[in-house]
From Swiss-Prot:
Placement of covalent cross-link Glycyl lysine isopeptide (Lys-Gly) (interchain with G-Cter in SUMO1): K250
Organism whose genome encodes this protein: Homo sapiens
Zinc finger MYM-type: from-to: 362-402, 414-457, 464-499, 510-544, 554-592, 600-631, 708-742, 749-788, 795-829
One example of a Gene Ontology biological process annotation: regulation of cell morphogenesis
GO MF, any single term: DNA binding
Gene (UniProt): ZMYM4
UniProt entry keywords in alphabetical sequence: Acetylation, Isopeptide bond, Metal-binding, Phosphoprotein, Repeat, Ubl conjugation, Zinc, Zinc-finger
Biased composition (Basic and acidic residues): 1124-1134
Protein name as catalogued: Zinc finger MYM-type protein 4
Pfam entry (one): DUF3504
Any further remark recorded for this protein: The 3'-UTR region of the mRNA encoding this protein contains a motif called CDIR (for cell death inhibiting RNA) that binds HNRPD/AUF1 and HSPB1/HSP27. It is able to inhibit interferon-gamma induced apoptosis.
Stored InterPro entries: DUF3504, TRASH_dom, Znf_MYM, ZnF_MYMT-QRICH1
Stretches for region Disordered: 162-189, 1124-1183, 1231-1260
Tissue: Expressed at higher level in heart, skeletal muscle, kidney and liver.
Amino acid sequence: MAEREVESGPRKRFEQKSGAVFDEIVENCGGIMDTEMSEDIDHNLTPTLDSMSYGMPNQTGSENSLLDEDDYFLNSGDLAGIPVVGSDNEDEQDFSSKDNLVSSIHTDDSLEVERRVTQHESDNENEIQIQNKLKKDFPKQFDQVSVFKSIRKDFSLVRENSKETFSGKEKNRDLTYEREKRLDKPHKDLDSRLKSSFFDKAANQVEETLHTHLPQTPETNFRDSSYPFANKESIGSELGNSFASNIRIKEEPLDDEYDKAMAPQQGLLDKIKDEPDNAQEYSHGQQQKTQEGELKISAVFSVSGSPLAPQLTTGFQPSLASSGMNKMLPSVPATAVRVSCSGCKKILQKGQTAYQRKGSTQLFCSTLCLTGYTVPPARPPPPLTKKTCSSCSKDILNPKDVISAQFENTTTSKDFCSQSCLSTYELKKKPIVTINTNSISTKCSMCQKNAVIRHEVNYQNVVHKLCSDACFSKFRSANNLTMNCCENCGGYCYSGSGQCHMLQIEGQSKKFCSSSCITAYKQKSAKITPCALCKSLRSSAEMIENTNSLGKTELFCSVNCLSAYRVKMVTSAGVQVQCNSCKTSAIPQYHLAMSDGSIRNFCSYSCVVAFQNLFNKPTGMNSSVVPLSQGQVIVSIPTGSTVSAGGGSTSAVSPTSISSSAAAGLQRLAAQSQHVGFARSVVKLKCQHCNRLFATKPELLDYKGKMFQFCGKNCSDEYKKINNVMAMCEYCKIEKIVKETVRFSGADKSFCSEGCKLLYKHDLAKRWGNHCKMCSYCLQTSPKLVQNNLGGKVEEFCCEECMSKYTVLFYQMAKCDACKRQGKLSESLKWRGEMKHFCNLLCILMFCNQQSVCDPPSQNNAANISMVQAASAGPPSLRKDSTPVIANVVSLASAPAAQPTVNSNSVLQGAVPTVTAKIIGDASTQTDALKLPPSQPPRLLKNKALLCKPITQTKATSCKPHTQNKECQTEDTPSQPQIIVVPVPVPVFVPIPLHLYTQYAPVPFGIPVPMPVPMLIPSSMDSEDKVTESIEDIKEKLPTHPFEADLLEMAEMIAEDEEKKTLSQGESQTSEHELFLDTKIFEKDQGSTYSGDLESEAVSTPHSWEEELNHYALKSNAVQEADSELKQFSKGETEQDLEADFPSDSFDPLNKGQGIQARSRTRRRHRDGFPQPRRRGRKKSIVAVEPRSLIQGAFQGCSVSGMTLKYMYGVNAWKNWVQWKNAKEEQGDLKCGGVEQASSSPRSDPLGSTQDHALSQESSEPGCRVRSIKLKEDILSCTFAELSLGLCQFIQEVRRPNGEKYDPDSILYLCLGIQQYLFENGRIDNIFTEPYSRFMIELTKLLKIWEPTILPNGYMFSRIEEEHLWECKQLGAYSPIVLLNTLLFFNTKYFQLKNVTEHLKLSFAHVMRRTRTLKYSTKMTYLRFFPPLQKQESEPDKLTVGKRKRNEDDEVPVGVEMAENTDNPLRCPVRLYEFYLSKCSESVKQRNDVFYLQPERSCVPNSPMWYSTFPIDPGTLDTMLTRILMVREVHEELAKAKSEDSDVELSD
């Protein structure tokens, strides 16, 4: 006894410790696992002991306490009851101690009983101390454990075995106590004894099933019955890795009496009610019941019996490893199963009969609860929680984008946001393991890892081995391979295994790996897709799928279209099909579409009647046939029929009389859908002119209240001509055949031609202004429009109503006028003044067909409709209980003899048959009969008075004799001069007999006869050399164009006439240039004639080209007196060296009195050279033209007007150069027509200047004889050829008196002086024009190298001034080329255009004349230049002014203005530009690509047109611009613009 008490002490302590330990563990683990189960759908419980350590402090302090019996940890059987589930993926386990969670999981009932017994035997103080100690130390000691990851079954097994061991130990010691314990609770002990291996399995299944299928039961067991048991080792080997390798567990001997006590008792077993063991026994009597919806009791069985398990755990049976293991498994106490009635919520006792509804998991205690129970409403779905991508850790907002994947070594699935994240995660998780198979390692071609190869791709004759689907997807993406990939998930579709599914959508065949991907793709994309049969547009998510014989899935809008499609396929195939009535294989003659989309085929009409009789039977006799009340539709397809407008026939579907209103509406909708679908495929319209059928958009004509349809515009026009469709033309006011009718401001306007319509619109634009535009909805023209921004585009409407309608149409909320379907309407039609909108062309055809049919209403149709309504409106009592039957069946093939032909003919002919219904009891029969239209009523005749009056007509006969004229004169009056006959010797061939080659025959022989040739020989020429020289001069002087030659010839004649006049007639007269400069004369003439008009300006300008020529022709002051000429040269002898008299160092514009008017700042110039606007609100400036005061000349030899150009410098330089040239000619150094080098040493001329050797050339034309010429010192006496050749040599050989070369600006100054001298002395030659082209080329080459000189005082120096060009008539309106030169000068100076490219960008559209009102009501006229918009890229020929680069968005090109010159109108740029416009053609004044035009070669001064429509040659423009860039004022303006740009940059 003492020993037993000693042993019982440790056992008590062990039970106290183990009870406290596992109470705490179960509560902590249960709370966490309850939370995890609520989050995990698969109920995968997660371990909670990862963060706990298993080392416990020893109570006694001994090192070998683990081997002692007192160690409660190793010997505790309750340790195996810890509900821990091992996870294969250790990365997901992140747990901590959760003491604050309230556990909602109840432990097993056996654990509660054991704990209750332990508490009675233990001391309260020891229990409180042990529990406090364990609560303090237990969480800390289980921090480092990592091997407690076995499945719950493992711990249950250890727990039950240990309990059995301890039960055997206390068998011999406390037998009396155990017997009393069993007597206190007989039901528990009895249930334990009844447990066998079969009952153990059933009890576990019941427990698991209740946990899975009965969520309302409060008890929950966490044992996974589906876990496959294996052969487990002992507790020491199972937990040995967790503690130590040398742990030994104390083994106790088993007691055989305990097993005998636990054996079942036979007496108690006989008292238990036997229940059926399987579902076949209790459901055997239920198979005969066929009425759907009838209450069925699926099972009746005991609550605690074994048959409950197979009913609740179908497909959820555990697999046992061996039969011996069942003996080792302990029995589960029956008290763990507590089932309550779903109706009254009472607890079902053991052995009580329970009832279960078929297909439901709920149990009921009686049939009363079973019949009175109503299904509770479904719980609202839990709020969607945001899922996180396992790869990139981003929240997946859209649940449709979630990709769940389950890996090989885990039972849980992971979520990913995209396929790329899934592939990345797989690569990260894929271990780098070398797999050696027969010492051969295979490497993946994508990830370069040694792994098992799953795919091999032969690409470009190279086999690529891939280890996974992710690598296979990457390989396809990298090489742009369009292989069999699923459109939804991107996976590979193995077409060889039959897993590849095809979907026909949007005209393309898309591949899918499974039917679920097809459904997901339809739901995800939800595209508007046309039906495969009727082509109506529906969302793909709402359409019905059907897979045809080729394996392609097609989409249909309704079951009706699907049925019709199947009928069409069966009909077109022509194969033999089994009849649904007689089961005979034959070609089907009749088809019936059922409500479920299936097709019933019949071989004859008798089979149809037999099949129809099946539906006349009472309900319940045959449940395999779907009743027609669910909405059958009889499909009739008229083969070869065509729906035509204008009296054509339409195919109709006979309506089916049905019992309920809902079914009637369904059938009516189905019949209408079928009718629309088939009519669309065959509908055609009939042209009113050519009577042809067409299926295109019709051409409509609204005439006399009717709409006429035509197949095209030609038929419409021909119909108008034939039927005289005439109306008053709105423009020409003549009644003609209507060509087009357009709506203006709500009224229809008719026009006879396209030209009248355009002219009328042009007149409206003038009256209404620029707002004469068209409404975007009704297409009518209105003066007032309402604007609205739709889709980023501004639309204009005539009224608010049109704007609202267009808005509804734009947002696809409008309905089609034909099919009444809402959506995108892409077609429109104007029908009787209203705009109709349609889905597509088919809807237009349907609408026009319906309108044409509905226009002439038929009495026959009206009668039929009324009869149908009367027949359907029968007694409601009879129609309520009747069963609908098949109304009509139509054959698709030829009608057999047994078929009634009345119905089929009525349908094929398009007539609407009358419907008569005969109702007999529960069955009804409906027949269709064709009723002929009633005969027309007799015509009413009335008396009518007739008044007949003959039409008389008077006929008159007029006789008139026919007269003829005949000449009978006797005297011959010669009307033409007599022809003098001149004998001309003509050789005549006289034929003679041929003597067969034996005699000589005459042969024609030509004799030259001299003929007189007229030649023009000048009488003043005495020698041959002079004649040849004159001829060559004439050839060189005369231009190639005949009109220009006539003009020059006239000018020479005028000059010769002036030279012949005597000196007495050369009195002092006011020269032309004095008139040009005389301010009083100008004010007298110009001020009174200027009116601003272009034509009056051209006439009133006193110095036009025409007046210039007339003035030279009339005046006679060309020849001056000899003494005055000598005096002039004597006075001009001082003007010898230009550069010496005007050195650049002494230049000062202020001292010269050149009062330059202050000019407002111009716009800064952009990169492209055009002026650009300033920012910060600076006011626009106007370029003012600076008038110059006319300075009186201080030098002698100039005109009396005091011009600043001293032309005597040029004259003297020419004279000195000619003297040097003639001196060399006398020495034989110069020859005409050859090129010869002079002496290498410089020579001194008689004036003391040394001239260098130069090249001399006269003419390069062939036939020119080499001869020597002598230039004249008097430039006025030089001919055109001499002047042209001399100027070419002059600019190259002229030197200063000291022998130095002239600067380029000085040479141009001398040439301008020569030009001015020629004009002053009556010569109209302009040496800067095309006849002197050789001289112009050489001069341009010389001036190109010149750059302006910057003086130390900051001024720019150039000897060429603006005034010089005005004086020598290079600026003005004297000729077309001079006027172009003037415009070029103004644009260069004031618009800062410095190269040819910038000038070529000018156009008439960019230069406009404007007027502005100034102070004191004065008006100012100016020219505004709008620079064109420039592109981003820079061109090489653009000159950038300014250092700062601005963005194009910051600057908008603004026009630069140039004001008129009111001080001197002859130099006004505005007036000159207007005169230029007056001489241009009207066709070029609005062009935006040309400004400088080519002068006409044949024009005269009084010609209305000076310029052609072609732009001037860029080479000519470059020659003119080179001379303009020599002007000092031009460079000053450019420098000012550049300095202003710098100031703007500094201010910014």
